[in-house]
Amino acid sequence: MKFIIKLFPEITIKSQSVRLRFIKILTGNIRNVLKHYDETLAVVRHWDNIEVRAKDENQRLAIRDALTRIPGIHHILEVEDVPFTDMHDIFEKALVQYRDQLEGKTFCVRVKRRGKHDFSSIDVERYVGGGLNQHIESARVKLTNPEVTVHLEVEDDRLLLIKGRYEGIGGFPIGTQEDVLSLISGGFDSGVSSYMLMRRGCRVHYCFFNLGGAAHEIGVRQVAHYLWNRFGSSHRVRFVAINFEPVVGEILEKIDDGQMGVILKRMMVRAASKVAERYGVQALVTGEALGQVSSQTLTNLRLIDNVSDTLILRPLISYDKEHIINLARQIGTEDFARTMPEYCGVISKSPTVKAVKSKIEAEEEKFDFSILDKVVEEANNVDIREIAQQTEQEVVEVETVNGFGPNDVILDIRSIDEQEDKPLKVEGIDVVSLPFYKLSTKFGDLDQNRTWLLWCERGVMSRLQALYLREQGFNNVKVYRP
């Protein structure tokens, strides 16, 4: 079998040296991706296309599908390459190939020709089109908007009968641009923004700020692995997970409510910039869209950018949510995003939409930056190829209950402000307060002979924290959902 790879048009308008470099990189990317399907396949580059030849017919569909997801490819032609002698021979071969497709349909013939011949492309179109029209009674020629277009390519003494055309994702080959670090949360925005930078030729590494235990991290790892495996598997990339719970706890304890959102984002950018510098990455990528939430106003984004010299790319800055969700659906991350737990631990009651630099800096003076340095230093860095094996490992489960036993105690893990606003009172059972950001250090001080039922309003944080405690060896925890 043979495929002809057509280049993304923006590649073809580059200077000769740049075009050759892009084609060389794309050829290498294709080899890296397809070697898993057929180690004997051949990938041959030309000035205006790339040929892929493979022997294993059982892998035809898999190879074709993989090619449509490699950045830099405009479209793929599945072809049959045969010799020919003259125009009548071309017609006879086209008749055998296309007769069944043209029965009862309107059609036209389009020919591309390279080499020296005693006929032109138009001559072949007329001859083959007239012959097909005569020999297939139910078919008729229609040059504009036909139901079937017969594509033929003539190159020297070879005829390419095009059996199918399949659209690629376009863009530039990965590796033609410099590396970036995507701040991925597993939601709609960060997945789409990561894809857009891969499509533009960047090798995308991933940085995840873990705010809620292993279950959340496993979900985000699956999203990152899916994106890499589907669109970027030609290159090795890193997945860096940073345990940000200590940072969140420090913010909740010391920072003014209205400034929390902006300061949390500033801390994330600081941490991600340190990671980027460590690995020689040139830019950060976020899924922020202008005005989508309070921290994404121009004033706040400018303040967030100010904490780092690292370039921050926001490919979705002018996109609305519906457009982003549609893109997520196209690339296959929508289902991941819909089921991803939404972290609700740092939500200000009255977040500022126009933060003042002096106020932000004054609040940050209360923050212990050694905590930030420590979590970055302890960041977990893994090769994304290892994630598939790791996520297959059994995840600790936690029981959810809606009633009480004689030894049970409800543990309200909401922030102090939330508890003061809406105190939890349940008849017939004790309620103890311990904010989620103190669980890792204070839960061990509680009476371990009791069974602790973790509770928060949405049930997301309580489940994540219960999973975390189970992983730490505390088996006396459950989730309370009335």
Swiss-Prot record:
It is an enzyme of class 2 (transferase). One of its GO terms (biological process) is thiamine biosynthetic process. Residues 61-165 form the THUMP domain. GO terms for cellular component: cytosol. The active site is at residue 456. It comes from the Bacteria. It is found in: Cytoplasm. ATP binds at residues 183-184, 265, 287, 296. Pathway: Cofactor biosynthesis; thiamine diphosphate biosynthesis. SMART domains: THUMP. Its EC number is 2.8.1.4. It catalyses: [ThiI sulfur-carrier protein]-S-sulfanyl-L-cysteine + a uridine in tRNA + 2 reduced [2Fe-2S]-[ferredoxin] + ATP + H(+) = [ThiI sulfur-carrier protein]-L-cysteine + a 4-thiouridine in tRNA + 2 oxidized [2Fe-2S]-[ferredoxin] + AMP + diphosphate; [ThiS sulfur-carrier protein]-C-terminal Gly-Gly-AMP + S-sulfanyl-L-cysteinyl-[cysteine desulfurase] + AH2 = [ThiS sulfur-carrier protein]-C-terminal-Gly-aminoethanethioate + L-cysteinyl-[cysteine desulfurase] + A + AMP + 2 H(+). GO terms for molecular function: ATP binding; CCA tRNA nucleotidyltransferase activity; tRNA binding; tRNA-uracil-4 sulfurtransferase activity. Its main location: cytoplasm. Disulfide bonds join 344-456. Gene3D superfamilies: 3.30.2130.30, HUPs, Rhodanese-like domain. Catalyzes the ATP-dependent transfer of a sulfur to tRNA to produce 4-thiouridine in position 8 of tRNAs, which functions as a near-UV photosensor. Also catalyzes the transfer of sulfur to the sulfur carrier protein ThiS, forming ThiS-thiocarboxylate. This is a step in the synthesis of thiazole, in the thiamine biosynthesis pathway. The sulfur is donated as persulfide by IscS. HAMAP family: ThiI. Belongs to the ThiI family. This is tRNA sulfurtransferase. The gene is thiI.
